[in-house]
Amino acid sequence: MAGGAMVQTVGGKTYPGKMTAFVFFTCLVASSGGLIFGYDIGISGGVTSMDSFLSEFFPSVYAQAKASKDTNQYCKFDSQLLTLFTSSLYLAALATSFVAAWVTRVFGRKWSMFCGGVTFLAGSALNGAATDVMMLILGRILLGIGVGFANQSVPLYLSEMAPANLRGMLNIGFQLMTTIGILSANLINYATSSIEGGWGWRIGLGLAGVPALIITLGALVLPDTPNSLIARGYAGDAKRVLVKIRGTDDVHDEYDDMVAASEEAASIEHPWRNILHRKYRPQLTIAILIPCFQQLTGINVIMFYAPVLFLTIGFAGDASLMSAVITGLVNMFATVVSIISVDRLGRRVLFLQGGTQMFISQVVVGTLIALQFGVAGVGEMSRSYAILLVLFICMYVAGFAWSWGPLGWLVPSEVFALEIRSAGQSIAVCVNMMLTFVIGQAFLTMLCHLKFGLFYFFAGWMLVMTTFVALFLPETKGVPIEEMNHVWSRHWFWGSYVTAHDVAGAGAGGGGNRRSHNV
């Protein structure tokens, strides 16, 4: 495939190479790890809105859901056990992220992806065959282990395989696959909800094994990244892979920089302690705040509970599932916009535009719900009013899909120096999963108590995070990850933490961010 022939670095170097069919294929296969993440997000919200599923496992919630329209609509799905079914996955992923970091470092990126696929496959089988709530939650825990491995290894794999000038586009492949997984799950929910006998939810939960099988088999045929191979002592293999993915034999400079970076990283004995050093303060801040902010957009509760949310605000069963399909389509196509524009417009432009759009949409959605249901939560919507509400929810989803969705994974994966990279990525995944669990577990209760104010709550956070990006996030478009320290040293605020001495000390490779050699 055609691509950029030279990659310009901040430090003035150029690495020869182009976008090859081989690197595109490997990144496409690796990105399928996002399918397991996205499929679960979509399927869990759908099955928890199905009468047959609720009546079998959550009868008290089923009774509330069937209550009269004269009762408080905000609270009819409020159940900690029901939310635990959804959010237990992310608690398991949180705990797994530290083990996954070690596996990713010691055995390589591809085998971490393989572990994720196998455990997700086991979890999907258990959920599809579940006969009680404990089987459901145990299956969710296995799914969470799979997600923990995939989210640790796939973003690193994509960042390390991609040429610097196309890193954003290829890395966002993970988010695109996530949106495809969500859309596929929404379509399956819609198709299986009307199956006679009430066992359609088993199909939805069991079919999670399909994306798990794709990433499992894909991991077996993928090469590992040159960075990981060098770090594990396979220098010859690393150079052969680098030649193949760059489409040229002239990879000496890039290879030498990788080796130098690996040697410096190998000398670091305590990366978890070192990440607290002053010169890594910018990266540590990004590792914590970007995934934290990503969840505080409120997107995952929209995606988890889209059918439940639409039922809450007055949609019929089939209409709520179809509305979730519509938001899934918007999510997928808007992610394509991000793929096309991220390496042209840059990260900051997408963050700022998307954040502004999401803020406006959240305020409008909250206001529309307030006008219709008020504080009491009693009322019904006309068809035209419902269409208007879905329109603004779709605007919100689109804003997320070309900004905080893909960039929330891309930016943390590309900013770390090599010697702290695995520790940094683990922190990013850990924070993401922790906030996903907390917000997912609390959402239905928050909806019950905050009512329409919940959307204003998330809108307020949109203001905070958009301001943070405007002031404190430098542009990383087109910057090779070995040269990322230059970006921090030239920033108006972070330059006081990353000095010229730190940049010089990074040398050709020490400032790199392509590997997670040490945990």
UniProtKB/Swiss-Prot annotation:
The chain crosses the membrane at residues 19-39, 81-101, 111-127, 129-149, 168-188, 203-223, 296-316, 322-342, 358-378, 387-407, 427-447, 452-472. Expressed in panicles before heading. Expressed in flowers before pollination. The keyword ATP-binding does not apply. GO terms for cellular component: membrane. PROSITE patterns: MFS, SUGAR_TRANSPORT_1, SUGAR_TRANSPORT_2. SUPFAM superfamilies: MFS general substrate transporter. One of its GO terms (molecular function) is symporter activity. It is found in: Membrane. Keywords: Membrane, Sugar transport, Symport, Transmembrane, Transmembrane helix, Transport. Pfam families: Sugar_tr. Residues 40-80, 128, 189-202, 317-321, 379-386, 448-451 are extracellular. Mediates active uptake of hexoses by sugar:proton symport. Can transport glucose, xylose and 3-O-methylglucose. May play a role at the early stage of seed development. This is Sugar transport protein MST5. It comes from Oryza sativa subsp. japonica.
